[in-house]
Each structure stands twice: as C-alpha cells, then as structure tokens.
C-alpha cells in the first residue's frame, strides 16, 4: 500500500504479485490491478479488476465489488474502446450497488452510473446533483467530486461553459489536495478537464492545471494516454507545436498494440497539427481510413480547404452543422457546432459565396453570445471581419480588432496571426503602411510557428504591397523541420520503412524527404548522410 501511495508502481506490483501467490483475495487483486494501471498495462489491469470483482462477490463485499466493476468499466470502455464491455460492467456495478438501497452512500454511485448512460441532459443533470448531495451527506469525496466533474461536463455541453468549467476546477482542487482515493476517479476528472478545455479552446485553464497538478501526475503516473491526446490538441491550439507532437505521438504509440479507437483519436489530432503546419500530404496520409471517426470533421474539413477542395469541405461541414438559424440557438449548439461554423465561413468565402458566408457568420455570432467564451466570440468577430473584407461593406477593422483581442486573451497564437493577416488585407488600400506592419507581424508569427502555408500567404501580401521580405533558407540550415527529423533517424540506422513508421508518413514521402535533404546538403547517399549526422553530433 505504501508503494502505491508513493507512486512506486513497480514495487507495488512486485509486492502484490507475491501476496497473490499466498491469497487470491479481492483486496490483493484490486491493489495489483491499480499497480498495473499505473504502469499503463491497461489490458492486464482490466483483467485483474474483473478477478477482483469476482473475489469480492465471493467474499460478499458488494461495495468493493461495485468499485472493481466500475474500474473495469472505465478501462474497457474509456481506454480500450470496448463500449459494449463497458456497458456490461456498468450495468453489473449498478445492479450490485442498488442492493444497498437509497439510504446508503452506494446509491450515489448508482446515480452516477445512471447519469453516464442517460441521453437527456436535463435528467443527467438532476441525477448528478442528487449524487453530489449524497456524497456530501455521507462524507464520500469520490462520489461528490466525480459527480461534480461530470456535472461540469453537462453544463459545458449545454452552453453554460464558464459555470461548468468552474465545477471542473473545484473537482481538480479536491483531487490535488488528495481528497479522492479511487484511481479511476482521478483519471476521469483529469480527462474531463482536458476534454472540456480542448472543446472550448481554454488554453490558459489547461495550462494552469497541468502546472498545479504536475507533482501529482508525475508521482502517481495518472492521466491515461488517451487523455493526453486531448492535451495534445490543447497544445496545438496554444501554438506549442513541438510539445503537441510529443504528446500526440506518445499517445498514438502507446495504443499501437491493437487499441485502435484510442490511437485514432491521437492520429486525428496529429493530422490537424500537420494541416496547421502546411504539411498537407502527411495530414492526408494520417487521415486515410479515418473518414468516419466521430472526431475527424474539423481536421478533414480543414485539410480539404487547404488543398483547394472547397466543395468537399462544404459538403462535410453542411452535413454536420445543420441546425436552427433562429434567434435562439439550439441547446449545445455553440459548444459543438460553433468552431465548425467558423470553418464553414472560410469555405464559403473561398468559393465566393458571400451570401451564405454572411448568413453563417451571423449564426455564429448569435451562438457565440450564448456561450460567453472568448474563443468563440473572437471566431465570430473574425468571420464577420472576413465577410466585410470580401464584400467591401461594413467596418471590418472593428470586427478584426475584436477578434485580435479575443484570440490574444485566449492565448491562441495561430488565430492571432491569421487575424493580423486579415487586418492587413482590410487596410491594404486605406492605410498601406499599417497593413505592411500587420502583415510583417503575421509573417513573423507564422514563421515562429512553422506554419509554412500561412507564411507564404503573408509573404505574398507583403510583396503585393511592395514591401521587401526575406527569402531563401533561414540561418545556417536549409532543411525543413521534417527533413531534419528524417536526417536524424538516418543517423540512427533506421531504414525508410522504419522512418515512415516512426513519423507516421508513407515510404514514398520518406523517399522524397531523403532526396531533398541529400540535395540540400550536397550528399550522395544515405551512408554519407549517416556520416554527416555522426560528424556534426546530430541526435534525435
């Protein structure tokens, strides 16, 4: 037990494996399952939770059996992606815990389980509020704060974003203070935070909690790998692309061994990063076969638009954003649909369809008002500003300044740079000197982010305004970031197929990068490239 509390999962595993040889008790099996979970041996951990459940049933410890069943449900469903198995374990936990009756703390867990599978948001909210009250009445923080975290998610999904996020903050504060004891609850609360922050682009909140909880996450090895896919998405929005790539690749690599549902979520976010970087071929390769995944729409639509396939992007976005154009938005519309509407405005503008672009921008503005979040309001202002620029009507500068302030407050550097570029376009005839200054700022931001496609657009605008810009390779190296990565891996002795597997790109793409880097460095073959790496002490 001490090893588990100290976060030494390996020592705890050894101790409980020895104890298991002497007694097949529910407690020993459950503790071993916890140690395996902390080592991220999820399949084996789930199997031991299932064995712990059976042992507790034999020992007539129903509360403990329900706890083991809930842990098995969390792993099989939320980590391994087997939703039918998850539903079975949730149903089993609910049946067992219902035997205790409504006057016991176990009823709080029953309500949480019911809420988890309840499709109606209002009913779900009622169940969770009842569970919170039970947790407080019986002094059970695991019930109270897990229900509170889930309630926060319900509020976010029903457009009460700030209220919901504050409930998530409270749950995490209790978690960091050590009030919760159940391992699955800890991961559920962390994952809920990352999911919500990614959904509403709340970069500052996620960043603050990652710092505040750093000791807990490091010591206990909590936060499942698939939760880190959400965090990778947040880092992408924050412009911290190298960190995002590390998180997303680690999450994808962890699930390489057959857990495809969770691997795919990380791969889709990696593809979205590639689109932002302008590495469109790699993004397309990553998304091949994932076109029906529920998370794919933003990345796939953005890829279509970037490749000049506006009709494909329009068809995809129109199908998933159908809803009311009335004065009162549908419940949940701002949280789920808002970001897609912003992308749809870009598509209509690309096609020259100003009427539909204005209609969707106005719809986006209405639902942004319902959410009260800085990101969506800024996105709505940017959309209206772009419509004004394209149509030559209205006051685009006012909208774009609003967008600039909102994106800066939300700490979204890519969106700040995009807005500066639009502001430069808006001012190009009236105030060319100011337009040049804004375009130069945008270009510097895009170059810092390594957003090649957008940097090219900023450079083209500057040239059209008669402003000199730097051309050619920057610094002493002529290699792109991806070419440098390929060069480093050549130095480790990897073959082209192995490099492709490591970087999630095709063999043909690897061959292209190898040819380019050899030409740029004046090398004749891979052997000379490997020698170059060794001579210059280049490490991956």
Predicted regions and their residues:
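Residues within the DNA-recognition helix of helix-turn-helix
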Residues: 48, 438, 513-516
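Single-residue signature of alpha-solenoid repeat helices
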Residues: 12, 45, 85-86, 124, ...
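Residue signature of alpha-solenoid helical repeat architecture, marking inter-repeat boundaries
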Residues: 23-26, 30, 59, 63, ...
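TPR-repeat structural position
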Residues: 9, 42, 62, 82-83, ...
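Tandem amphipathic alpha-helical repeat scaffolds
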Residues: 1, 5, 30-41, 66-82, ...
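Amphipathic alpha-helical segments of tetratricopeptide repeats
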Residues: 17-21, 50-61, 74, 91-99, ...
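Generic long, charged, amphipathic alpha-helical segments
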Residues: 356-422, 465-476, 498
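Helix-turn-helix DNA-binding segment
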Residues: 411, 460-463, 469-515, 519-524, ...
């Amino acid at each position: 037990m001490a090893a588990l509390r100290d976060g030494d999962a390996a020592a705890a595993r050894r101790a409980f494996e020895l104890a298991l040889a002497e007694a097949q008790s529910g407690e020993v099996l459950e503790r071993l399952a916890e140690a395996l979970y902390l080592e991220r041996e999820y399949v084996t951990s789930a199997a031991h939770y299932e064995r712990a459940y059976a042992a507790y049933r034999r020992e007539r410890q129903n509360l403990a059996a329900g706890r083991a069943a809930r842990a098995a449900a969390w792993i099989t469903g939320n980590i391994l992606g087997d939703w039918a198995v998850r539903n079975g374990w949730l149903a089993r936990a609910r049946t067992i815990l219902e035997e205790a009756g409504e006057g016991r703390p176990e009823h709080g867990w029953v309500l949480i389980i019911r809420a988890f599978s309840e499709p109606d948001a209002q009913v779900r909210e009622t169940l969770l509020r009842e569970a919170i009250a039970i947790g407080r009445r019986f002094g059970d923080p695991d019930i109270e704060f897990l229900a509170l975290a889930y309630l926060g998610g319900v509020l976010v999904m029903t457009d009460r974003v700030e209220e919901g996020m504050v409930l998530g903050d409270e749950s995490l504060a209790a978690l960091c203070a050590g009030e919760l004891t159940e391992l699955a609850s800890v991961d559920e609360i962390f994952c809920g935070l990352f999911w919500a922050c990614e959904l509403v682009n709340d970069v500052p909140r996620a960043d603050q909690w990652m710092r505040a909880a750093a000791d807990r996450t490091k010591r206990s090895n909590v936060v499942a790998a698939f939760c880190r896919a959400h965090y990778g998405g947040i880092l992408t929005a924050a412009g911290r692309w190298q960190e995002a790539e590390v998180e997303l690749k680690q999450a994808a690599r962890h699930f390489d061994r057959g857990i495809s549902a969770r691997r795919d979520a990380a791969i889709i976010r990696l593809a979205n990063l590639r689109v932002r970087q302008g590495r469109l071929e790699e993004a397309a390769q990553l998304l091949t076969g994932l076109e029906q995944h529920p998370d794919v729409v933003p990345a796939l639509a953005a890829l279509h638009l970037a490749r000049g396939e506006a009709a494909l992007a329009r068809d995809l976005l129109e199908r998933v954003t159908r809803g009311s154009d009335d004065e009162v938005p549908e419940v949940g519309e701002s949280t789920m649909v808002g970001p897609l509407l912003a992308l749809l405005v870009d598509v209509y503008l690309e096609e020259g369809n100003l009427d539909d672009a204005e209609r969707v921008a106005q719809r986006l503005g209405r639902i942004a008002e319902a959410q009260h979040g800085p990101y969506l309001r800024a996105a709505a202002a940017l959309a209206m500003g772009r419509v004004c620029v394209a149509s030559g009507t209205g006051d685009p500068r006012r909208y774009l300044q609003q967008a600039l302030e909102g994106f800066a407050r939300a700490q979204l550097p890519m969106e700040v740079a995009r807005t500066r570029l639009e502001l430069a376009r808006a001012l190009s005839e009236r105030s060319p000197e100011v337009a040049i200054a804004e375009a130069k700022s945008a270009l510097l931001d895009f170059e810092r982010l390594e957003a090649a496609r957008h940097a090219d657009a900023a450079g083209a605008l500057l040239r059209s305004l008669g402003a000199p810009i730097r051309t050619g390779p920057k610094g002493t190296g002529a290699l792109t970031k991806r070419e440098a990565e390929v060069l480093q891996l050549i130095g480790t002795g990897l073959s082209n197929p192995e490099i492709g597997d490591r970087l999630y790109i095709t063999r043909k793409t690897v061959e292209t990068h190898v040819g380019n880097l050899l030409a740029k460095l004046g090398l004749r073959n891979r052997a000379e490239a490997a020698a170059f790496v060794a001579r210059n002490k280049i490490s991956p």
